[in-house]
Amino acid sequence: PWRMLRITIFIRLIFEVIALQRISSVQPMRTPKTADFGFSFYAPYEAAVETAFLALCAARMQLEEESTPFAVRSMTFRLKSPASIRDKLTRRGLPQSAEGAAYLHDIAGLRVVLSSVEAVYRFADILRASPSWQFVCARDYIAVPKKSGYRSLHLVMLVPICRNGKSASVPVEIQLRTPAMDMWACVEHDLCYKPVKEA
């Protein structure tokens, strides 16, 4: 049974990696180009997301082999838009430039939805121990939720990449949460960040 389970998980991961490659291949066409946050600005973050996603796939296999099968419900990623970057830079009083954006750790983000709180923390332990990146910090909004009720475990990792023959480390934020937490986060985002349309 475990042999068949491993084969099933492996096939699922192959399809997810293929999907990631297809999305990544067209991402630059969907990324708005501005003076400071153009295609060249996003390139290192795209490379870091691809590397991080593969590391998540490996961690997923380890988690599902040692504990509950299909503990990982979904894995998604996104790159913060230029408008969102500018808004955050303004809130933090940072320069509206690539240099200012270097202080942000969530331009590249990945989200993993897991079946339970226990699976969230176990998955976090696996990620911290992975040689694919360097663990920077964690913000545990599960143990201490935000005032809005938002709950999630955020991990910041430095992902090594090689571009144009030069190596660099790019920060990536990984959000871990359960389906219920994910649903609440979506509701909160719609209420807090979407503009209200006048009738």
Residue ranges and their predicted role:
Residues 5-7:
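Alpha-helix boundary/capping motif
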Residues 44, 48-94:
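Surface-exposed, low-hydrophobicity interaction/linker segments
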Residues 101, 108, 113-199:
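Long beta-strand-rich cores associated with HINT superfamily self-processing modules
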Residues 17-63, 167-199:
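An acidic, glycine-/histidine-flanked metal-binding catalytic module
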Residues 94-104:
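Short, flexible, solvent-exposed loop/turn segments with mixed acidic/basic and small polar residues
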Residues 36-44, 104, 113-118:
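Amphipathic alpha-helical interface elements
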